From Swiss-Prot:
Similarity section: Belongs to the LpxB family.
Protein name: Lipid-A-disaccharide synthase
Keywords: Glycosyltransferase, Lipid A biosynthesis, Lipid biosynthesis, Lipid metabolism, Transferase
SUPFAM superfamilies with a match to the protein in the record: UDP-Glycosyltransferase/glycogen phosphorylase (SSF53756)
Gene: lpxB
InterPro entries (UniProt xref): Glyco_trans_19
Originating organism: Hahella chejuensis (strain KCTC 2396)
Enzyme class: transferase
Reaction catalysis annotation: a lipid X + a UDP-2-N,3-O-bis[(3R)-3-hydroxyacyl]-alpha-D-glucosamine = a lipid A disaccharide + UDP + H(+)
Record-level GO BP terms: lipid A biosynthetic process
Cellular component aspect of the GO annotation: membrane
Protein backbone atom coordinates (compact mmCIF):
# COMPACT_ATOMS: atom_id res chain seq x y z
CA UNK A 1 0.00 0.00 0.00
CA UNK A 2 1.19 3.57 -0.73
CA UNK A 3 1.97 5.65 2.39
CA UNK A 4 -0.75 8.20 3.23
CA UNK A 5 1.37 10.39 5.48
CA UNK A 6 4.85 10.68 6.96
CA UNK A 7 3.54 12.40 10.10
CA UNK A 8 4.13 10.50 13.36
CA UNK A 9 0.70 9.14 14.32
CA UNK A 10 0.09 7.35 17.64
CA UNK A 11 -2.33 4.45 18.01
CA UNK A 12 -3.46 2.92 21.30
CA UNK A 13 -4.29 -0.80 21.16
CA UNK A 14 -5.47 -3.31 23.78
CA UNK A 15 -5.41 -7.01 22.81
CA UNK A 16 -6.30 -9.53 25.50
CA UNK A 17 -5.44 -12.96 24.10
CA UNK A 18 -3.30 -14.85 21.58
CA UNK A 19 -5.81 -14.53 18.72
CA UNK A 20 -5.96 -10.75 19.31
CA UNK A 21 -2.15 -10.55 19.36
CA UNK A 22 -2.05 -12.24 15.94
CA UNK A 23 -4.65 -9.84 14.50
CA UNK A 24 -2.91 -6.86 16.12
CA UNK A 25 0.50 -7.74 14.62
CA UNK A 26 -0.99 -8.14 11.11
CA UNK A 27 -2.83 -4.83 11.45
CA UNK A 28 0.28 -3.01 12.71
CA UNK A 29 2.27 -4.18 9.65
CA UNK A 30 -0.34 -2.76 7.28
CA UNK A 31 -0.79 0.50 9.22
CA UNK A 32 3.01 1.02 9.08
CA UNK A 33 2.79 0.66 5.29
CA UNK A 34 0.33 3.59 5.30
CA UNK A 35 2.00 5.59 8.10
CA UNK A 36 5.73 4.69 8.24
CA UNK A 37 6.18 6.89 11.36
CA UNK A 38 3.30 5.26 13.31
CA UNK A 39 3.85 4.21 16.93
CA UNK A 40 1.68 1.79 18.92
CA UNK A 41 1.17 1.36 22.68
CA UNK A 42 -1.20 -0.20 25.21
CA UNK A 43 -1.45 -3.95 25.90
CA UNK A 44 -0.21 -6.54 23.40
CA UNK A 45 1.52 -9.90 23.11
CA UNK A 46 4.75 -11.32 21.67
CA UNK A 47 3.81 -10.91 18.00
CA UNK A 48 2.84 -7.27 18.47
CA UNK A 49 6.06 -6.62 20.44
CA UNK A 50 8.05 -7.92 17.45
CA UNK A 51 6.34 -5.24 15.35
CA UNK A 52 7.61 -2.54 17.74
CA UNK A 53 4.64 -2.35 20.14
CA UNK A 54 5.11 -0.72 23.57
CA UNK A 55 3.09 -2.73 26.12
CA UNK A 56 2.23 -1.37 29.58
CA UNK A 57 1.32 -4.80 31.00
CA UNK A 58 1.91 -8.42 30.02
CA UNK A 59 -1.00 -9.51 27.84
CA UNK A 60 -1.29 -12.82 29.77
CA UNK A 61 -2.68 -10.85 32.73
CA UNK A 62 -5.86 -10.32 30.68
CA UNK A 63 -6.21 -13.91 29.40
CA UNK A 64 -8.61 -15.26 32.02
CA UNK A 65 -11.17 -17.99 31.51
CA UNK A 66 -14.35 -18.31 33.55
CA UNK A 67 -16.41 -16.09 35.82
CA UNK A 68 -14.86 -17.27 39.11
CA UNK A 69 -11.33 -16.51 37.89
CA UNK A 70 -12.43 -13.06 36.69
CA UNK A 71 -14.04 -12.25 40.06
CA UNK A 72 -10.86 -13.26 41.87
CA UNK A 73 -8.80 -10.88 39.74
CA UNK A 74 -11.34 -8.05 39.45
CA UNK A 75 -9.45 -5.39 41.49
CA UNK A 76 -6.30 -5.95 39.40
CA UNK A 77 -8.24 -5.84 36.10
CA UNK A 78 -10.07 -2.64 37.10
CA UNK A 79 -6.76 -1.01 38.10
CA UNK A 80 -5.25 -1.93 34.71
CA UNK A 81 -8.27 -0.52 32.91
CA UNK A 82 -8.10 2.72 34.93
CA UNK A 83 -4.38 3.09 34.13
CA UNK A 84 -5.05 2.66 30.38
CA UNK A 85 -7.94 5.18 30.41
CA UNK A 86 -5.93 7.73 32.46
CA UNK A 87 -2.88 7.39 30.19
CA UNK A 88 -4.75 7.89 26.92
CA UNK A 89 -6.99 10.65 28.33
CA UNK A 90 -3.88 12.57 29.45
CA UNK A 91 -2.03 11.99 26.14
CA UNK A 92 -4.72 11.39 23.48
CA UNK A 93 -3.72 9.07 20.61
CA UNK A 94 -4.91 9.56 17.00
CA UNK A 95 -7.01 6.42 17.52
CA UNK A 96 -7.72 3.80 20.17
CA UNK A 97 -8.47 0.23 19.03
CA UNK A 98 -9.73 -2.63 21.20
CA UNK A 99 -9.14 -6.11 19.77
CA UNK A 100 -11.65 -8.72 20.96
CA UNK A 101 -11.81 -9.15 24.83
CA UNK A 102 -15.02 -7.03 24.81
CA UNK A 103 -15.69 -7.18 28.56
CA UNK A 104 -12.38 -5.38 29.11
CA UNK A 105 -11.97 -3.22 26.00
CA UNK A 106 -15.44 -1.81 25.32
CA UNK A 107 -15.48 -0.03 28.71
CA UNK A 108 -12.16 1.62 27.78
CA UNK A 109 -13.46 2.60 24.34
CA UNK A 110 -16.56 4.19 25.89
CA UNK A 111 -14.57 6.37 28.31
CA UNK A 112 -12.04 7.43 25.67
CA UNK A 113 -14.72 8.26 23.11
CA UNK A 114 -16.50 10.38 25.74
CA UNK A 115 -13.15 12.21 26.10
CA UNK A 116 -13.21 13.00 22.36
CA UNK A 117 -10.81 10.27 21.17
CA UNK A 118 -11.58 8.29 17.98
CA UNK A 119 -12.22 4.61 18.82
CA UNK A 120 -12.62 1.36 16.90
CA UNK A 121 -13.18 -2.26 17.88
CA UNK A 122 -11.79 -5.26 15.96
CA UNK A 123 -13.70 -8.60 16.23
CA UNK A 124 -17.35 -8.34 17.17
CA UNK A 125 -18.63 -9.92 20.37
CA UNK A 126 -21.50 -12.38 19.69
CA UNK A 127 -24.17 -9.69 20.17
CA UNK A 128 -26.11 -11.04 17.17
CA UNK A 129 -26.52 -14.36 19.04
CA UNK A 130 -27.31 -13.35 22.61
CA UNK A 131 -27.38 -10.33 25.00
CA UNK A 132 -28.30 -8.23 21.96
CA UNK A 133 -28.86 -5.11 24.08
CA UNK A 134 -25.03 -4.83 24.35
CA UNK A 135 -25.16 -3.24 20.89
CA UNK A 136 -26.47 -0.01 22.47
CA UNK A 137 -23.36 0.30 24.66
CA UNK A 138 -21.15 -0.56 21.67
CA UNK A 139 -22.89 2.18 19.62
CA UNK A 140 -21.85 4.72 22.28
CA UNK A 141 -18.33 3.28 22.63
CA UNK A 142 -17.04 3.05 19.04
CA UNK A 143 -16.73 5.18 15.93
CA UNK A 144 -16.20 1.99 13.92
CA UNK A 145 -16.70 -1.77 14.38
CA UNK A 146 -14.49 -4.11 12.30
CA UNK A 147 -16.09 -7.55 11.85
CA UNK A 148 -14.59 -10.81 10.61
CA UNK A 149 -17.89 -12.18 9.26
CA UNK A 150 -20.51 -10.60 6.95
CA UNK A 151 -23.63 -11.48 8.98
CA UNK A 152 -22.10 -9.59 11.96
CA UNK A 153 -21.78 -6.46 9.81
CA UNK A 154 -25.45 -6.76 8.77
CA UNK A 155 -26.48 -6.82 12.43
CA UNK A 156 -24.57 -3.58 13.18
CA UNK A 157 -25.99 -1.83 10.11
CA UNK A 158 -29.49 -2.72 11.32
CA UNK A 159 -28.61 -0.96 14.60
CA UNK A 160 -26.98 2.06 12.89
CA UNK A 161 -23.46 1.32 14.16
CA UNK A 162 -20.70 2.28 11.65
CA UNK A 163 -19.18 -1.04 10.55
CA UNK A 164 -16.74 -2.56 8.08
CA UNK A 165 -16.59 -6.28 7.25
CA UNK A 166 -12.88 -7.02 6.73
CA UNK A 167 -12.86 -10.81 6.33
CA UNK A 168 -11.42 -13.60 8.47
CA UNK A 169 -7.63 -14.11 8.72
CA UNK A 170 -8.08 -17.91 8.88
CA UNK A 171 -9.53 -17.77 5.35
CA UNK A 172 -6.18 -16.43 4.12
CA UNK A 173 -4.01 -18.91 6.07
CA UNK A 174 -5.93 -22.04 5.00
CA UNK A 175 -5.58 -22.95 1.28
CA UNK A 176 -8.70 -23.17 -0.89
CA UNK A 177 -7.88 -26.80 -1.74
CA UNK A 178 -6.15 -28.55 1.21
CA UNK A 179 -4.19 -31.72 0.33
CA UNK A 180 -5.64 -34.63 2.34
CA UNK A 181 -3.05 -37.21 1.20
CA UNK A 182 -0.08 -34.93 1.99
CA UNK A 183 -1.53 -34.19 5.43
CA UNK A 184 -2.02 -37.90 6.20
CA UNK A 185 1.60 -38.51 5.21
CA UNK A 186 2.73 -35.67 7.52
CA UNK A 187 0.75 -37.08 10.47
CA UNK A 188 1.78 -40.70 9.78
CA UNK A 189 -1.78 -41.80 8.93
CA UNK A 190 -2.37 -44.45 6.23
CA UNK A 191 -3.38 -42.76 2.95
CA UNK A 192 -6.06 -45.37 2.17
CA UNK A 193 -9.37 -45.90 3.96
CA UNK A 194 -11.74 -43.49 5.66
CA UNK A 195 -10.75 -41.41 8.67
CA UNK A 196 -12.96 -39.37 11.01
CA UNK A 197 -11.38 -36.56 13.07
CA UNK A 198 -12.94 -36.18 16.52
CA UNK A 199 -12.55 -32.84 18.34
CA UNK A 200 -14.30 -32.70 21.74
CA UNK A 201 -12.99 -29.16 22.48
CA UNK A 202 -9.93 -27.44 23.92
CA UNK A 203 -11.21 -26.67 27.44
CA UNK A 204 -11.51 -29.13 30.31
CA UNK A 205 -15.24 -28.51 30.80
CA UNK A 206 -16.02 -29.15 27.13
CA UNK A 207 -14.03 -32.40 27.09
CA UNK A 208 -15.76 -33.54 30.32
CA UNK A 209 -19.19 -32.96 28.79
CA UNK A 210 -18.59 -34.14 25.21
CA UNK A 211 -15.62 -36.54 25.44
CA UNK A 212 -17.52 -39.59 26.79
CA UNK A 213 -20.35 -39.10 24.24
CA UNK A 214 -17.85 -38.75 21.39
CA UNK A 215 -16.00 -41.91 22.47
CA UNK A 216 -19.29 -43.84 22.65
CA UNK A 217 -20.03 -42.51 19.14
CA UNK A 218 -16.68 -43.93 17.97
CA UNK A 219 -17.65 -47.30 19.53
CA UNK A 220 -21.10 -47.15 17.86
CA UNK A 221 -19.50 -46.47 14.46
CA UNK A 222 -16.77 -49.09 14.96
CA UNK A 223 -19.42 -51.79 15.43
CA UNK A 224 -21.08 -50.84 12.15
CA UNK A 225 -18.05 -49.73 10.12
CA UNK A 226 -14.94 -51.52 11.49
CA UNK A 227 -12.90 -50.21 8.50
CA UNK A 228 -13.20 -46.53 9.60
CA UNK A 229 -10.35 -45.13 11.70
CA UNK A 230 -10.41 -42.16 14.07
CA UNK A 231 -7.94 -39.43 14.99
CA UNK A 232 -8.29 -37.18 18.06
CA UNK A 233 -6.05 -34.09 18.38
CA UNK A 234 -5.48 -33.12 22.04
CA UNK A 235 -5.17 -29.34 22.59
CA UNK A 236 -2.55 -29.80 25.33
CA UNK A 237 -1.15 -32.37 27.78
CA UNK A 238 -4.02 -31.91 30.26
CA UNK A 239 -6.61 -32.62 27.53
CA UNK A 240 -4.57 -35.60 26.30
CA UNK A 241 -4.58 -37.16 29.79
CA UNK A 242 -8.32 -36.46 30.10
CA UNK A 243 -9.09 -38.13 26.72
CA UNK A 244 -6.82 -41.12 27.51
CA UNK A 245 -8.76 -41.69 30.75
CA UNK A 246 -12.07 -41.51 28.86
CA UNK A 247 -10.80 -44.04 26.29
CA UNK A 248 -9.85 -46.53 29.05
CA UNK A 249 -13.47 -47.68 29.33
CA UNK A 250 -12.96 -49.41 25.95
CA UNK A 251 -9.63 -50.97 26.91
CA UNK A 252 -7.75 -49.96 23.76
CA UNK A 253 -10.18 -51.79 21.45
CA UNK A 254 -11.07 -48.74 19.34
CA UNK A 255 -9.03 -47.73 16.24
CA UNK A 256 -8.14 -44.29 17.66
CA UNK A 257 -4.90 -42.34 17.17
CA UNK A 258 -4.31 -39.55 19.71
CA UNK A 259 -2.21 -36.68 18.34
CA UNK A 260 -0.63 -33.77 20.22
CA UNK A 261 -2.25 -30.52 19.01
CA UNK A 262 -2.31 -30.19 15.15
CA UNK A 263 -6.11 -29.98 15.17
CA UNK A 264 -6.27 -28.25 11.77
CA UNK A 265 -3.95 -30.84 10.21
CA UNK A 266 -6.09 -33.65 11.66
CA UNK A 267 -9.17 -32.07 10.10
CA UNK A 268 -7.40 -31.79 6.72
CA UNK A 269 -6.38 -35.48 6.93
CA UNK A 270 -9.96 -36.61 7.66
CA UNK A 271 -12.93 -37.52 5.45
CA UNK A 272 -15.44 -36.21 8.01
CA UNK A 273 -15.29 -34.45 11.38
CA UNK A 274 -17.18 -34.77 14.67
CA UNK A 275 -16.63 -31.66 16.74
CA UNK A 276 -17.78 -29.32 19.47
CA UNK A 277 -19.40 -26.04 18.45
CA UNK A 278 -16.99 -23.08 18.26
CA UNK A 279 -14.27 -21.61 16.02
CA UNK A 280 -13.24 -25.15 15.04
CA UNK A 281 -16.44 -25.36 12.94
CA UNK A 282 -15.13 -22.46 10.83
CA UNK A 283 -11.77 -24.25 10.38
CA UNK A 284 -13.60 -27.47 9.41
CA UNK A 285 -15.53 -25.49 6.79
CA UNK A 286 -12.33 -23.87 5.46
CA UNK A 287 -10.61 -27.27 5.08
CA UNK A 288 -13.77 -28.36 3.14
CA UNK A 289 -14.64 -31.39 5.26
CA UNK A 290 -18.19 -32.55 6.09
CA UNK A 291 -18.90 -32.27 9.80
CA UNK A 292 -21.36 -33.07 12.56
CA UNK A 293 -21.51 -30.39 15.26
CA UNK A 294 -22.44 -31.20 18.85
CA UNK A 295 -23.17 -28.88 21.75
CA UNK A 296 -23.73 -29.80 25.39
CA UNK A 297 -23.94 -27.61 28.47
CA UNK A 298 -24.72 -28.21 32.12
CA UNK A 299 -28.55 -28.46 32.38
CA UNK A 300 -29.08 -25.07 34.09
CA UNK A 301 -26.66 -23.27 31.73
CA UNK A 302 -28.44 -24.79 28.73
CA UNK A 303 -31.85 -23.75 30.08
CA UNK A 304 -30.62 -20.15 30.48
CA UNK A 305 -28.86 -20.11 27.09
CA UNK A 306 -31.94 -21.40 25.26
CA UNK A 307 -33.89 -18.42 26.53
CA UNK A 308 -31.17 -15.90 25.66
CA UNK A 309 -30.06 -17.27 22.28
CA UNK A 310 -31.39 -15.28 19.31
CA UNK A 311 -29.46 -16.97 16.48
CA UNK A 312 -31.06 -19.66 14.30
CA UNK A 313 -27.91 -21.82 14.29
CA UNK A 314 -24.93 -22.49 16.55
CA UNK A 315 -22.26 -23.44 13.97
CA UNK A 316 -20.44 -20.85 11.88
CA UNK A 317 -20.93 -22.63 8.51
CA UNK A 318 -24.73 -22.56 9.01
CA UNK A 319 -24.67 -18.96 10.24
CA UNK A 320 -22.59 -17.90 7.21
CA UNK A 321 -24.78 -19.78 4.72
CA UNK A 322 -27.98 -18.84 6.59
CA UNK A 323 -29.19 -22.41 6.11
CA UNK A 324 -28.67 -25.85 7.69
CA UNK A 325 -25.59 -26.93 5.71
CA UNK A 326 -24.22 -29.12 8.51
CA UNK A 327 -26.08 -31.15 11.16
CA UNK A 328 -26.19 -29.62 14.66
CA UNK A 329 -27.08 -31.96 17.54
CA UNK A 330 -27.71 -30.07 20.75
CA UNK A 331 -27.96 -31.22 24.38
CA UNK A 332 -30.22 -34.35 24.62
CA UNK A 333 -30.05 -34.87 20.84
CA UNK A 334 -26.27 -35.34 21.04
CA UNK A 335 -26.44 -39.12 21.62
CA UNK A 336 -23.92 -41.67 20.24
CA UNK A 337 -26.55 -43.21 17.92
CA UNK A 338 -27.73 -39.87 16.48
CA UNK A 339 -24.18 -38.55 16.08
CA UNK A 340 -23.07 -41.84 14.50
CA UNK A 341 -25.95 -41.92 12.03
CA UNK A 342 -25.29 -38.30 11.04
CA UNK A 343 -21.59 -39.07 10.46
CA UNK A 344 -22.39 -42.05 8.24
CA UNK A 345 -24.50 -39.74 6.05
CA UNK A 346 -21.65 -37.20 5.90
CA UNK A 347 -19.26 -39.89 4.59
CA UNK A 348 -21.38 -40.25 1.43
CA UNK A 349 -19.22 -39.24 -1.58
CA UNK A 350 -21.96 -37.20 -3.33
CA UNK A 351 -22.70 -35.37 -0.10
CA UNK A 352 -18.99 -34.57 0.30
CA UNK A 353 -18.74 -33.12 -3.21
CA UNK A 354 -21.76 -30.84 -2.87
CA UNK A 355 -20.56 -29.59 0.53
CA UNK A 356 -17.08 -28.87 -0.85
CA UNK A 357 -18.62 -26.51 -3.43
CA UNK A 358 -20.72 -24.75 -0.78
CA UNK A 359 -17.74 -24.43 1.57
CA UNK A 360 -15.48 -23.07 -1.18
CA UNK A 361 -18.01 -20.31 -1.91
CA UNK A 362 -18.12 -19.37 1.79
CA UNK A 363 -14.30 -19.49 2.00
CA UNK A 364 -14.03 -16.98 -0.87
CA UNK A 365 -16.70 -14.79 0.76
CA UNK A 366 -14.66 -14.30 3.95
CA UNK A 367 -11.22 -14.21 2.25
CA UNK A 368 -10.89 -10.43 2.07
CA UNK A 369 -7.25 -9.81 3.14
CA UNK A 370 -8.38 -8.80 6.63
CA UNK A 371 -5.29 -6.89 7.82
CA UNK A 372 -5.17 -4.69 4.70
CA UNK A 373 -8.93 -4.00 4.80
CA UNK A 374 -8.80 -3.23 8.55
CA UNK A 375 -5.78 -0.91 8.14
CA UNK A 376 -7.51 1.02 5.34
CA UNK A 377 -10.67 1.41 7.46
CA UNK A 378 -8.59 2.61 10.44
CA UNK A 379 -6.70 5.09 8.20
CA UNK A 380 -10.00 6.53 6.90
CA UNK A 381 -11.15 7.04 10.49
CA UNK A 382 -7.87 8.75 11.45
CA UNK A 383 -7.99 11.03 8.38
CA UNK A 384 -11.65 11.93 9.07
CA UNK A 385 -10.62 12.83 12.62
CA UNK A 386 -7.82 15.04 11.28
CA UNK A 387 -10.16 16.90 8.91
CA UNK A 388 -12.72 17.42 11.70
CA UNK A 389 -10.01 18.75 14.09
CA UNK A 390 -8.61 21.05 11.39
CA UNK A 391 -12.09 22.39 10.55
CA UNK A 392 -12.83 22.98 14.25
CA UNK A 393 -9.57 24.95 14.63
CA UNK A 394 -10.33 27.00 11.50
CA UNK A 395 -13.86 27.66 12.78
CA UNK A 396 -15.64 26.04 9.77
Amino acid sequence: MTPISERPIRIGIVAGEASGDLLGAGLMQEIKALYPQATFEGIGGERMLKEGFNTFFQMERLSIMGLVEVLGRLPELLAMRRRIVDHFTATPPDLFLGIDSPDFTIGIELKLRQAGIKTAHYVSPSVWAWRQNRVFKIAKAVDLMLTLLPFEARFYREHNVPVKFVGHPLAEIIPLHPDKVAMRHELGIDASGEVIAVLPGSRGGEVSRLGPTFIETIAWLHQRRPDVRFVIPAANQARKTQIEQQLQSHGGRLPVTLIDQHSRECMMAADAILLASGTATLEAMLVKRPMVVAYKLATLSYWIMRRLLKAKYISLPNLLADKALVPELIQNDATPAKLGEALLKELNVERRRSLEDEFEGLHKLIRQNASVAAAQAVAELIEKGRVATHDAREGH
